[in-house]
Amino acid sequence: MSYNRSRRLFIGGSVAASAIGASGLSNLVSAQSVEAAASQPAVIYGPKPGVAKLNANENPFGPSPAALEAIATASAQGGAYYAYPAAMTLLDMIAERHGITRKHISLSAGSSPILSYAAVAASKNGKILGPDLFWDTTSKAPEKQGAPEIMRIANTAELDIDLDAMYAAIDDSIGMVHICNPNNPTGKVLAPNKLRDFCIKASKKTLVLVDEAYNELIDEPPKHTMIPLVKAGHNVIVARTFSKIYGLAGMRVGYLIASEENTEWINRYGMGGYTLNQAGLAAAIASYNDDAFLTFSKAMF
């Protein structure tokens, strides 16, 4: 039996309801949905059994139990609707934790889109400067639009980011400095006082982006974040994601923290939170303050 139902049936459903009855329609749709699902091809949602997938640093334990419950509820109750209210809830949670406002935060489907928006925006002002080894995928985005290639500075012999050499390379041709801390793929962590001093000096010359995707996985995460520099008015932006320790890489939720001016400027180059979905937002909201799950994941990661 065809599952071809017009929107008119649901809007003006008095005729259908009288003929079939509300429960009958529900049973009919349920039966057809089960039949349709059974005919779909098998989908692989993660690595095959026995395979340890390491290349993207996802949390192998996946979403927390609270997140899984929230995903199911949001999918059932909100799957038919756009996710604006849930996005506002997550914005408020992030803002409260860091003592900022909604206007300092831009949500995106994972941190990759917002990092790409920042790179494209910054490329209008000059080249992007980064170390030889860092997660450069998003900073390469402007190259597809004809922007110059990333200007790279050699890492030290110990694979650390050479902050002194990076600072010396900043001139009027640089539109943004991109640093990952902890760095990917080296795993090296910059001393917080050294990175803080660098960001303060460098941000007087150009925009500084610090990607903190792995911040929650290091000891004393608050000590290492550069978000206080944003609050202090420095030309610094910080990216975060729910894809790593929170186990939500497949749910696609991330965000950027910046000044109101930088947030508005970067958002011109993308759709921001409009790209998010109910299930992902529900999972992020349920996970954000789940300290027990984060402690477990950090110990086992």
Where are these regions (language model features)?
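C-terminal segment of classical bacterial N-terminal signal peptides
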Residues: 22-28
